[in-house]
């Protein structure tokens, strides 16, 4: 098996296939074997798992996933990698590579088709520019037991942030609504070719079987969260007033106070149970109109 984390092997592959890294696709490939090994270990992947991998690149993580998992389905956008992957991971009979845009894939249908008797998990080294939409799609698909991603460290910290922290955001709430995130380890820039300008980090999200709070309507919940973070320096009352035109400020004040929230509070200080209580109260008030 070709060691695609060996710089000499990487250079040979680059020369053999005339491959050029694409900045527009955010291609930064791993060149250190310990990284994919630790990702698989931290992901808790075993032979009972079926894994969707997004963006295999040259296949270093794919190799480790195939060793550990029952089956791996890798989704790759760049068709110029087809001959490279045939050489680097072609020997694995538990691997299927689909050349497609992961953002256009019906993930629940794919998981149902490929992993009928396996516990589905997702694993990805995500390009920085598409981290949020891909991770959101993985979580909203509600078809995985866990999702493990390598992202920019700043994004990893945002995913794991606590209410009131400077990096707490609507994306934090979304990630924690669907899963329980754990920051596994950092990955220095020198572990990639070409080297990015930032440090990366690996985060594992154990997907929740049930929401962390009672929520009457997901749409209203996330509408409330988006409104709360739309203007970080404004009070929650002003943020809600700007986004919920169907309510006057006096009515919004009464709704907030009914769930124990002062009108002067800022949205970024609310945790998920508080957002749940507020969104439920807003929904009930709207339905009562």
What are these regions (language model features)?
Residues 1-227, 254-257, 266-268, 277, ...:
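Catalytic cores of RNA-modifying enzymes
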Residues 249-252:
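Short amphipathic alpha-helix in the helical subdomain of ABC transporter nucleotide-binding domains
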Residues 230:
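Conserved catalytic loop of SAM-dependent methyltransferase domains
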Residues 259-261:
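Primarily EF-hand calcium-binding motifs
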Residues 241-246:
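Short helix-coil junctions and helix-kink-helix linkers
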């Amino acid at each position: 098996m070709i060691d695609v984390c060996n710089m000499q092997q990487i250079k040979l592959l680059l020369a053999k296939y005339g491959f050029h890294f694409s900045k527009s696709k955010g291609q930064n490939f791993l060149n250190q074997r310990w990284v994919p090994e630790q990702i698989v270990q931290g992901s808790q992947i075993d032979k009972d798992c079926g894994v969707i991998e997004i963006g295999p690149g040259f296949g270093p993580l794919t190799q480790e996933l195939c060793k550990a998992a029952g089956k791996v389905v890798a989704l790759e956008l760049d068709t110029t990698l087809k001959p490279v992957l045939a050489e680097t991971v072609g020997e694995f009979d538990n691997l299927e590579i689909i050349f497609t845009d992961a953002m256009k894939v019906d993930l629940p249908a794919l998981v149902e088709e490929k992993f009928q008797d396996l516990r589905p998990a997702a694993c990805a080294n995500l390009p920085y520019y598409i981290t949020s939409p891909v991770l959101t799609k993985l979580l909203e698909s509600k078809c995985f037991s866990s999702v493990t991603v390598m992202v920019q460290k700043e994004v990893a910290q945002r995913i794991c942030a606590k209410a009131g922290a400077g990096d707490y955001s609507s994306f934090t709430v979304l990630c924690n609504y669907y899963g329980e995130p754990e920051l596994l380890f950092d990955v220095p820039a020198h572990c990639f070719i070409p080297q990015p300008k930032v440090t990366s980090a690996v985060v594992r999200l154990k997907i929740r079987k049930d929401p962390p709070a009672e929520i009457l309507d997901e749409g209203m919940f996330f509408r409330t969260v988006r409104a709360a973070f739309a203007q970080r320096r404004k009070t929650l009352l002003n943020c809600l007033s700007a986004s919920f035109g169907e309510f006057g400020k006096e009515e919004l004040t009464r709704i907030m106070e009914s769930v124990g929230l002062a009108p002067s509070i800022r949205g970024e200080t609310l945790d998920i149970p508080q957002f749940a209580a507020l969104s439920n109260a807003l929904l009930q008030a709207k339905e009562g109109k």
